[in-house]
């Protein structure tokens, strides 16, 4: 019988099925698998029952390795156990997977398959991770669509239990895991009928228990190990028939036909593609298109990849097939070919059938694969000598592996399908609104629906594109929309940056959010856009969603205005019903944030419908001619890579563009060329009110506001409007607070922290400040001035150039101000090892690199290894540098010792002696290095080769580097804690900066061991106290430790950073960082104020532990925080992560709130005792 139809994504489908068969799950967040664990956690908290009448027991672990170990233990104890992971997380589970398979335990690993980090990190889908564990002994089952995930995930669980073999159930990350489809949901009652209860009983009876004790995991010798390994063969031999049997039962239940290998296409096909994953849906769609035009082609979809059953493989391939292409979504450098291709060739080697077989790679790292690419593959198979070892979807103009793109103009989508594309900005709500819209269409109508959301890695402020399809036929199009019926754009600045209307069909609809009135459109819209609108009879509408949102008090969240306008224009369902459904979705999405938020969004829906304006398109637009613009002279990287990528044209870049940077090396300072212009309002300097305190620049997350010192001559030559005032503290300079409107995120923290009554900064609309762009560029062009202040003061630090600028961090980010400050103090000699996480994403999302250089070309050098090994990676960087500097010191010492025999220039000798005596000192190291390099004696010695004083390869190491290890609390408190502890214990001179947001910010806000009790994170509510990382580090006695909160005490922040860097040993700085995941009721524009509130309420304490004070006979612990004066519970109520607990779990909210306060008070009392001892 047909089941209930529901709109959901692949992750939800996998979670739904897995919940039914799971007693215990151990989890760890990693993109894109995290939503599976979140759903299971949410259902468990709601009391949802599995097939055994129990709620699932869920435990968040410190790493994926820990999660695999925990489910291994649960399985041995007789509990059915499941976990969810991807990419590097899956690799961390590998050792346990061998054990679980070897011990014949029925685990299921649900994997949203994702690229592995190689020359770069990539969070998007391919099969590198899944292929990497094919040798573990786990069975492997692959799905191609959301519906298949629902159906076949059940097969994985059922067969694992019956067959005693663990399963890796995998599907494409993002493309399937996050694609929303209307699917049929399996009923738990039907699944219960399929479950082999006797097999469950046997499994439980075989569990470890002291009532029937056995020993497992012995150490075996060569005499028996081999034999016992071979003894498990029978389980693998029996498994394919079991899988086929359960697939037959699912097929009978659903009417959808499943086999280990599913063939689709012409029964007498001559050409066939073999593949697995979402590409099979695209191939099926293309097969229908080609066969309808007289060709004879087909596709074999692989479901059960391990064990690979030859019997079932040959059963479904038409005997007419003569040419086969095998597609692998992975790359194995140095191998003869990729895995599935080798398996297929091996299969045919064992038969009498000898078709032509070629293989190719496709869609690595989430690359889109289109029907036109599939046609290229079929065209290749039709060639007299089909190309082998090909790639598709790229232009490989270096090793020439790529197939030429088919020039056919095709549309393979189902007839009657409507395609809509929505351009948005990360954090503007466009994606969330479209998720609501597609669920309304899918759940409230009889139409099929599909949604997919494409976005970059920026934390917010990046481009998002929502792709929605709906129609009366099933949708098999797992690729981005290239021909749209409707296009919406939520950002007016995009009209000059992107080809917004590319692919909009003639007669299609275009909705633009803009503040321009009808008269201004002719001036503001680019010529090419106007011409396209007129020439293609585009129905053009505008709405001032930003203005409406601000009037309603919604700030930059205008998503519901745009969404209601969409429903009005798209005419999918009656408008009154659409409004009703939208308001229901608002209640569901924002209900826990308070009725006021709900009411404002309801008004936004009504306003969006009422405010849409249809534009009468002038016919003259058809004949407009493009203006000739002289191109700017730009660095090759910017011109050839950054600009095309930022125009969303990176897919078309050829392989040759990356010649010379194959190892993943990117130049510094590229973010300065982006000029994103994403702010709604930007700060405007009120010259007469400013006291020149520089606090606004100090806390700016994006370095978009800076104090500039100007000479009289520079002031006289300045452009009009370049106001300045006499600089305080110096007699011969003028002062200006420069603002970059196009680099500002518009958070407003600068205005919030301004101490002047009436404020020296006011937030004004971005478009009103276009004149500031030229003034900013002039300010940056001025000659750098010597700092007239002490750089270790708040004011003085801001006269140092920030070497972290214009990152993709969220507006109001609490992390970047700390990192930026460190670069201002030590950036010219910094080496940074950065853990994967938020700070690695805002720190190095290609092509935007915010770490930059000074006028001498010096700046932070930055690298990322992995999430789990960052401390060790940073230590390794230090050890490598130390080894080279030791060689350098040996050379210098030898030169000085040989001075009587080989006389040195007196100046050089003095400089070398000074350098050798102070080589490990940070302050003054640049000056000492430059003195050595600048002496005439050094030049002469090098020229005459009289001594190996400083060999050229080592000269860069004269200056002592400042070694920093950056990471978030998920790294420092959890997955990387073991390594961090070891590095701190080593006594080596490294500086660790932990951005403590108290959640896993990068994966969506899950709890870490830094999360206090009562905080609602994605994995439900935290019930245990916050780990005191600082106290743990202090126990060594020789680690410098500080807790800081910039918004509470800027001077203490500066002092701690300066002391930590100067300390000749390990240092740990734990920095409180407000985050969008906290849900600040005062908004992220007040994130610095929130840090102050945290300290004033006693939620957070600022302190420093300085081991050198102990050596001087003083107390090494200094508590910098004052006695709390603010209400602790009021502070908690000001953040949604706490306040929502009352709405969700009122029965124990007060208890946990009190526990959180008691924990904080106890922690603070402990600090007080340390400070007074």
From Swiss-Prot:
[4Fe-4S] cluster 3 binds at residues 810, 813, 838, 1075. Binds 3 [4Fe-4S] clusters per subunit. Residues 681-710, 735-766 form the 4Fe-4S ferredoxin-type domain. This is Pyruvate-flavodoxin oxidoreductase. NCBIfam families: pyruv_ox_red. Its cofactor is [4Fe-4S] cluster. Its EC number is 1.2.7.-.
């Amino acid at each position: 019988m047909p089941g209930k139809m529901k709109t959901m994504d692949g992750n939800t489908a996998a979670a739904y099925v897995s919940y039914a068969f799971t007693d215990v799950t151990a989890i760890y967040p990693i993109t894109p698998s995290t939503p599976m664990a979140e759903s299971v956690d949410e259902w468990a908290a709601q009391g949802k029952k599995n097939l055994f009448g129990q709620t699932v027991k869920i435990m968040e672990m410190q790493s994926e390795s820990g999660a695999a170990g925990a489910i291994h233990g649960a399985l041995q104890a007789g509990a059915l156990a499941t976990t969810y992971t991807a990419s590097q997380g899956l690799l961390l589970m590998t050792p346990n997977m061998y054990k679980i398979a070897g011990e014949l335990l029925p685990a299921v690993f649900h994997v949203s398959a994702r690229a592995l980090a190689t020359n770069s990190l990539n969070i998007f889908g391919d099969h590198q991770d899944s292929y990497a564990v094919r040798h573990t002994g786990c069975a492997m089952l692959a799905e191609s669509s959301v519906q298949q995930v629902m159906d076949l995930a059940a097969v994985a669980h059922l067969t694992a239990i019956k067959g005693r073999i663990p399963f890796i159930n995998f599907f494409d990350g993002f493309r399937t895991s996050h694609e929303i489809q209307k699917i049929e949901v399996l009923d738990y009652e039907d699944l219960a009928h399929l479950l082999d209860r006797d097999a469950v009983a046997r499994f439980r009876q075989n569990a470890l228990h002291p009532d029937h004790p056995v020993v497992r995991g012995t150490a075996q010798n060569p005499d028996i190990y081999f034999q016992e390994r071979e003894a498990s063969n029978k389980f693998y031999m029996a498994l394919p028939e079991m899988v086929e049997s359960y697939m037959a039962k699912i097929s009978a239940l659903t009417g959808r036909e499943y086999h280990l290998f599913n063939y689709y296409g012409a029964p007498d096909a001559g050409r066939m593609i073999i593949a697995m994953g979402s590409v099979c849906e695209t191939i099926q769609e293309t097969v229908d298109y080609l066969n309808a035009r007289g060709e004879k082609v087909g596709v074999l979809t692989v479901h059960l990849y391990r064990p690979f059953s030859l019997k079932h493989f040959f059963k479904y391939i038409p005997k007419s097939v003569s040419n086969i292409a095998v597609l692998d979504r992975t790359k194995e450098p140095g191998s003869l070919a990729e895995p599935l291709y080798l398996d297929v060739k091996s299969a045919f080697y064992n038969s009498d059938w000898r078709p032509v077989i070629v293989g190719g790679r496709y869609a690595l790292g989430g690359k889109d694969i289109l029907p036109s690419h599939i046609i290229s593959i079929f065209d290749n198979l039709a060639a007299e000598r089909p190309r082998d070892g090909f790639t598709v979807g790229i232009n490989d103009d270096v090793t020439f592996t790529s197939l030429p793109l088919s020039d056919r103009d095709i549309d393979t989508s189902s007839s009657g399908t409507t395609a809509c594309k929505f351009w948005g900005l990360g954090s503007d709500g466009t994606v969330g609104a479209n998720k609501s819209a597609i669920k309304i269409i899918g759940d409230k109508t009889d139409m099929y629906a599909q949604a997919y959301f494409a976005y970059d890695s920026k934390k917010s402020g990046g481009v998002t594109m929502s792709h929605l399809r709906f129609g009366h036929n099933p949708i098999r199009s797992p690729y981005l929309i290239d021909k749209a019926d409707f296009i919406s754009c939520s950002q007016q600045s995009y009209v000059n940056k992107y080809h917004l209307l590319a692919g909009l069909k003639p007669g299609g609809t275009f909705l633009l959010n803009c503040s321009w009135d009808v008269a201004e459109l002719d001036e503001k819209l680019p010529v090419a856009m106007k011409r396209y609108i007129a020439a293609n009879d585009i129905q053009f509408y505008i709405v001032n969603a930003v203005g409406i949102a601000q009037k309603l008090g919604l700030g930059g969240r205008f998503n519901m205005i745009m969404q209601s306008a969409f429903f009005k224009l798209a005419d999918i369902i009656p408008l009154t019903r659409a409004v009703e459904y939208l308001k229901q979705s608002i209640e569901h999405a924002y209900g826990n944030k308070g009725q006021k938020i709900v009411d404002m969004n309801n008004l936004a829906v009504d306003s969006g419908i009422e405010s849409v304006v249809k534009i009468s398109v002038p016919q003259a637009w058809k004949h407009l001619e493009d203006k000739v613009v002289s191109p700017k002279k730009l660095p090759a990287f910017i011109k050839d890579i950054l600009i095309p990528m930022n125009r969303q044209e990176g897919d078309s870049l050829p392989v040759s563009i990356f010649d010379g940077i194959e190892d993943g090396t990117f130049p510094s300072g590229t973010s300065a060329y982006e000029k994103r212009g994403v702010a709604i309002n930007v700060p405007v300097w009120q010259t007469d009110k400013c006291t020149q305190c520089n606090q606004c620049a100090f806390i700016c997350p994006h370095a978009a506001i800076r104090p500039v010192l100007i000479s009289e001559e520079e002031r006289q030559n300045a452009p009009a409007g370049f106001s300045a005032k006499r600089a305080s503290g110096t007699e011969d300079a003028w002062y200006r607070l420069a603002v970059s409107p196009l680099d500002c995120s518009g958070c407003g923290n600068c205005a919030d922290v301004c101490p002047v009554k009436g404020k020296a900064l006011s937030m004004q609309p971005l478009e009103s400040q276009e004149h500031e762009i030229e003034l900013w560029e002039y300010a940056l062009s001025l000659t750098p001035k010597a700092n007239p202040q002490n750089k270790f003061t708040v004011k003085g630090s801001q006269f140092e150039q920030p070497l972290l600028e214009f990152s993709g961090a969220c507006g109001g980010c609490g992390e970047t101000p700390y990192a930026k400050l460190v670069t201002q103090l030590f950036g010219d000699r910094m080496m940074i090892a950065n853990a994967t996480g938020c700070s690695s994403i805002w720190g190095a999302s290609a092509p935007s690199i915010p770490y930059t250089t000074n006028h001498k070309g010096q700046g932070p050098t930055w690298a990322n290894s992995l999430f789990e090994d960052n401390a060790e990676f940073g230590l390794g960087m230090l050890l490598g540098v130390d080894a080279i500097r030791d060689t350098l010191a040996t050379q210098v010492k030898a030169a000085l010792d040989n001075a009587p025999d080989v006389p040195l220039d007196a100046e050089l000798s003095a400089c070398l002696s000074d350098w050798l005596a102070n080589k490990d000192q940070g302050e003054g190291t640049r000056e000492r290095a430059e003195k050595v390099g600048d002496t005439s004696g050094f030049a002469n010695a090098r020229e005459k080769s009289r001594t190996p004083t400083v060999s050229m390869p080592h000269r860069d190491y004269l200056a002592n580097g400042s070694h920093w290890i950056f990471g978030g609390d998920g790294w420092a408190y959890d997955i990387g804690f073991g390594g961090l502890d070891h590095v701190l214990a080593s006594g080596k001179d490294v500086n660790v900066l932990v951005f403590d947001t108290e959640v896993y910010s990068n994966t969506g806000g899950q709890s870490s061991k830094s999360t206090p009790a009562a905080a609602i994170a994605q994995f439900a509510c935290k019930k245990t106290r916050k780990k005191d990382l600082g106290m743990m580090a202090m126990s060594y006695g020789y680690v410098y430790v500080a807790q800081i909160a910039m918004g509470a005490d800027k001077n203490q922040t500066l002092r701690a950073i300066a002391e930590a860097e100067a300390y000749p040993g390990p240092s740990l700085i734990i920095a409180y960082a407000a985050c969008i995941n906290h849900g600040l009721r005062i908004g992220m524009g007040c994130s610095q104020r929130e840090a102050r509130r945290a300290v004033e309420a006693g939620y957070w304490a600022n302190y420093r532990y300085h081991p050198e004070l102990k050596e001087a006979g003083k107390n090494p612990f200094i508590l910098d925080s004052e006695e709390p004066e603010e209400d602790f519970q009021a502070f908690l109520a000001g953040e949604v992560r706490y306040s929502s607990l009352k709405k969700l779990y009122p029965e124990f909210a007060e208890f946990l709130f009190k526990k959180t306060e008691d924990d904080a008070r106890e922690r603070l009392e402990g600090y007080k005792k340390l400070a007074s001892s």
